[in-house]
């Protein structure tokens, strides 16, 4: 089936006030900004005509993620809770249906107010209890194994851990306020996993004996421990099939036990890859139309990401850049291979001056000749400077 064309149109209007009322196609909507909740930019929307409250992903019929396993900035559980309560204060007494990006709507004013209060309580509890234990000197993993939701909150279906989990959300709060370092100096500059595993196996000695013991622990249901010790054996020797298969069996059991769909998928995917290997999927090409919606500064940051700065470390270049469709000028420097830029006055001693539309910048970043042809209007000075950049474009350019 066709999935259509993915593209992006920049917003024609931006909500900037804490609450703002706008008519959209004749329908009055009240927008409530909720930044740094489920995402850095988020908002709830109340529709008075229907007494309907859209909660985006701030209330989602399940425990959500303060940290998402796919990778993203850690979310602020305290702000999340407070914005839900603000929505309750603003709209709670006049709402008859609440709906959101995932899961089912909720009807009835009393039900809705309980739903919002209980959801806010979950995120507030995770935030406050984690900080309490941080102040007592416990580490991230210790706290994740200490905290349990209050029994009454744990019994509510829409706060269950079907997506986010208490354990990884606790670790998210720890990460936000304390970072990765747990004050144990042996963790400052740890050996990478393969080197560590090889040394540990050297100390353990007979790996067959280790596997024999691990199988006994597997039979006792100690799946997490079995996964951890066999993971060490696999890192030390990826060709050790007995270790791979036992690790896969342990991960599979952990997946079967997981209430969270995200955890279950992670466990079962890990088990599959241990048994069958991993595939070399091609890099995603992304949507040029979507990328063209980026600001010029974001596009230049993207260009810096796409350049292999290690290979460029001997290069020192100065480029005057005019972005004609944004009516903006920048001074770019490749300083010891690092791309830095500012909107300061152009240099009289620049290696090159490039006049281009935004598409040209994106074309260089993605090594896309079609976009370069469409965007780059003029290059003065060192005409090979773009070729130099393209020569050192990394694999990230294809993503």
Feature annotation, model-predicted:
Residues 318-369:
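Low-complexity, glycine/alanine/valine/leucine- and proline-rich hydrophobic stretches
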Residues 392-398:
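Conserved small/polar residues in nucleotide/adenosyl-binding loops
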Residues 25, 48-50, 324-326, 335, ...:
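Short strand-coil-strand connectors
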Residues 1-25, 28-138, 275-290, ...:
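Metallo-beta-lactamase
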Residues 290-336:
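A glycine-rich beta-turn/hairpin centered on an aromatic-Pro dipeptide
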Residues 374-377, 381:
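Glycine-centered positions in the ABC transporter ATPase nucleotide-binding domain
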Residues 1-4, 89-97, 104-295:
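Accessory terminal helices/loops
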């Amino acid at each position: 089936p066709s999935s259509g064309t993915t593209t992006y149109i920049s917003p024609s209007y931006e909500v900037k006030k804490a609450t703002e009322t706008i008519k959209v196609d004749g329908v009055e909507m009240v927008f409530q900004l909720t930044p740094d909740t489920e995402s850095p930019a988020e908002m709830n929307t109340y529709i008075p005509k229907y007494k309907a409250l859209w909660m985006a992903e701030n209330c989602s019929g399940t425990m959500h993620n303060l940290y998402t396993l796919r990778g993203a900035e850690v979310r602020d559980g305290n702000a999340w809770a407070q914005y839900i309560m603000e929505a309750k204060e603003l709209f709670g007494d006049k709402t008859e249906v609440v709906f959101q990006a995932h899961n089912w709507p909720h009807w009835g004013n009393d039900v809705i107010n309980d739903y919002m209060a209980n959801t806010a309580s979950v995120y507030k509890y995770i935030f406050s209890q984690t900080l309490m234990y941080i102040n007592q000197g416990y580490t991230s993993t210790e706290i994740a194994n200490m905290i349990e939701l209050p029994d009454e909150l744990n019994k509510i279906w829409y706060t269950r851990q079907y997506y986010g989990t208490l354990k990884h959300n606790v670790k998210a709060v720890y990460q936000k306020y304390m970072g990765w370092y747990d004050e144990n100096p042996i963790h400052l500059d740890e050996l990478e996993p393969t080197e560590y595993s090889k040394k540990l196996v050297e100390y353990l000695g007979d790996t067959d004996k280790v596997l024999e013991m691990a199988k006994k622990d597997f039979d006792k249901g100690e799946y997490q421990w079995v996964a951890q010790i066999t993971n060490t054996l696999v890192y030390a020797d990826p060709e050790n099939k007995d270790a791979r298969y036992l690790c896969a069996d342990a991960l599979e059991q952990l997946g079967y036990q997981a209430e969270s769909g995200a955890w279950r998928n992670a466990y079962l995917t890990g088990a599959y890859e241990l048994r069958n290997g991993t595939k070399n999927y091609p890099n995603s090409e992304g949507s040029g139309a979507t990328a063209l919606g980026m600001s010029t500064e974001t596009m230049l940051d993207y260009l810096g990401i796409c350049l292999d700065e290690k290979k460029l470390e001997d290069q020192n270049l100065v480029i005057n850049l005019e972005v004609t469709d944004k009516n903006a000028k920048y001074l770019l420097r490749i300083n010891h291979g690092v791309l830095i830029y500012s909107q300061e006055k152009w240099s009289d001693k620049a290696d090159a001056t490039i006049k281009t539309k935004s598409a040209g910048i994106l074309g260089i970043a993605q090594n896309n000749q079609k976009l370069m042809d469409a965007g780059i209007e003029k290059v003065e000075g060192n005409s090979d400077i773009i070729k130099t950049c393209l020569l050192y474009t990394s694999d990230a350019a294809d993503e």
